[in-house]
């Protein structure tokens, strides 16, 4: 039984693929020791072959016909060959599928060399996750906040994206949908996009690029492709499977035409829309030509029509039966043009950049220098900037370069005269700072921004004229009545005419009626005052005389809701302020006379009426910048010699502010300001010198109702209005819109 096995070792060796190590040591009769892994013979080998056959879909029946008519060696050889063939076919199929998968995944096809199989599988999984979004969003709307409607969510998304949503047919480019946010972005009404194609809205030179992005055919993807996400050039080949895949990403940049819809200066924040247009545009266009903005479009290819939606009959008859559509968001792309673009659209550059070494030698110049100073960049390279500076300004410029080196990164500005190419002198403002090596902390070079001062001022003036002509800076004053500022010295020393508006812009003709009404109303509210410049408001060392006239009030405080102004006559306001400033500079007390105490006779008579918020009364005797000077009760320097001048009010826990300027905030005065002051002065006009405190009349009670808080009034509480409450108030309160 063991003889055939011992006789055929060579035959068995020839049947085995590859070299077989046979030491030849006989272990037993008919047995030979063989190194290496060798499968057993007989039923084991046949069962292994049958397992591989089952893997290929073939049953063990093909071996049944060899059981009787072939020897066992031939059957084993066929089984080994069949197994190798099956493995080869399986490997070929796997390689084919992985190659297709690699072509479908953009990150794989963008690699320089072919990745291995594990890398392809890993990138495919990542790509599928990115196509699904974050992985936790669902189509049932569970990701949407419950307190937001669909319309509100759409507006929030478009506002955050700062763009507009549009849907176009992939084959024809017909606009299926566009959001209303296209108006603030491209200044196009929504109706202009409906019924048109996207090819009509883009620049003629970008039509082919757009058609390539919308196409899903195989012919459009031959050649090299630039991947915008990775910044690499893909290899040549067909990408039809990716182009036809649902949800395939599209990202491209094109130029879209800007419309001419009227600007809504209320909703578009006035100047921001114009600045955005020029920042994202391609420069000024010629007269009659369309203006284009650079738009970055990102989106996906989707099936069209969606499930459950049918195409209208008119679209079917027109042949617009596209199977795909592009759903994308268009955002304005900031252009990288080095030319500075101002609001008028017709300006030339006013500044250029230059780089210098520590000695002032020019190592780099911005090409904008051609339009600013007339030199070519090569004319300036390698030269000292002092060569172009005026001889009288060279020392000043040299010191500024030495100083900026010591500042180490801080900006230093200097103005000097620069010689242009036409031998003329130009006033240049240079803002410079140093760049330091982050490792060695040494100064590498100096960066300078050089600006033509005169040309910049001219362009700013032209910009302002453009704004006023377009109506972008016209304030709507129909809801805010504003009174004019009386003649006087402003903060910067500039005299402001009484008829001049609070705003620096010129008046718009549309609001002439409003300004006329304001002028009429302020004339009615103004209290005449004829205080001469040489007359002293309060004599030093003399008690306060109650029988004073209107001359004692150099200015009347009139409060308009939202605006507080100080009004006085044109003839005496400047003189009064100059006299006050002289008194302050000499260190004298503004009102050092004996203040008569206010008796409480007239206060209890008013306790049965509701009181309004208090406000300070008196004349404009204290205009000091120090907040402590706004009340004579706040510091010993401004108090009267008699310490108990206001003892009655102090005991009642009610402070009486006698400064005329410390209570001009909007919350301090409610009611009729013109009537209050006219009644207040009429009472003083009717007083006699012998009666320091006349009896309270009906009109007097109405006046004090708006002036003094009553002690014990539940509406006032225990609030004590001291100077700390008005410490943050300036002499000229800011205007709040």
From Swiss-Prot:
GO BP terms in the entry: axon guidance; brain development; cardiac ventricle morphogenesis; cell-cell adhesion; diencephalon development; dopaminergic neuron differentiation; hypothalamus cell differentiation; liver morphogenesis
What keywords were assigned to this record?
Activator, DNA-binding, Nucleus, Repeat, Repressor, Transcription, Transcription regulation
Which residue ranges does the record assign to the bHLH domain?
78-131
Q: Where is the composition biased (Low complexity)?
A: 627-642, 659-688
Whether Mitochondrion counts among this entry's keywords is no
Query: What residues does the PAC domain cover?
Result: 413-456
Region Disordered: start-end pairs: 1-73, 525-556, 588-721
Q: Where are the transmembrane segments?
A: none
Which residue ranges have biased composition labelled Polar residues? 528-543, 588-626, 643-656
Q: Please state where this protein is localized.
A: Nucleus
Tissue pattern of expression reads: Isoform 1 and isoform 2 are most highly expressed in the brain, eye and skeletal muscle and to a lower degree in liver, heart, kidney and swim bladder. Isoform 3 is most highly expressed in the eye, forebrain, midbrain, hindbrain, skeletal muscle, gills and brain but is barely detectable in liver, heart, kidney and swim bladder. Before the pharyngula period isoform 3 is expressed throughout the entire embryo and during this period extensively in the brain and eye.
What is annotated about its quaternary structure and interactions?
Answer: Efficient DNA binding requires dimerization with another bHLH protein. Heterodimer with the aryl hydrocarbon receptor (AHR), SIM1 or HIF2A/EPAS-1.
Under the heading PANTHER family, the entry gives: CIRCADIAN PROTEIN CLOCK/ARNT/BMAL/PAS (PTHR23042)
Q: What is this protein called?
A: Aryl hydrocarbon receptor nuclear translocator 2
Provide the gene name from the record.
arnt2
